[in-house]
């Protein structure tokens, strides 16, 4: 990706995240942009549920809704669980040669699909890992997975910022509603 294409790519993702206040809608759009810009075959954004201590697919591209709903990972399990546990990105040139690759979604069925590269980066809120962004793309010996890893790390940071902003908005609204209830209660008690 050339510098001007890179700038345009990040601008488009930034615009997408800024125009949507609904998390899933904005994340699906981010995956659409990744698909068209990076020749992505499949992609997922997984989030860690800290209460259940399990990882779920929040949004996906190229994976059925049914697969998304049934697939969960434990911390440290498979590549995605390992990335979320360690907070370190992982790039696999050919998933067919990686024993840790679980293929839980069963979305990679043919031999042709096994010649895929897999890149998974953590989504961090400060120092805390809250999820992962992963991409399958056709294997190309000349393609720099490290460069793709860096691009995806920037996208993951943008996604984390978006999650934080939406969380802040939700908390502010909740605080305002509670304050409104309290003031209404005071008024009712006075009159």
Features from the language model and the residues they span:
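Regulatory loop-to-helix N-cap segments in sensory/regulatory domains
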Residues: 1-2, 136-153
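Signal-transmission/dimerization alpha-helices at domain junctions
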Residues: 82-89, 126, 151-170
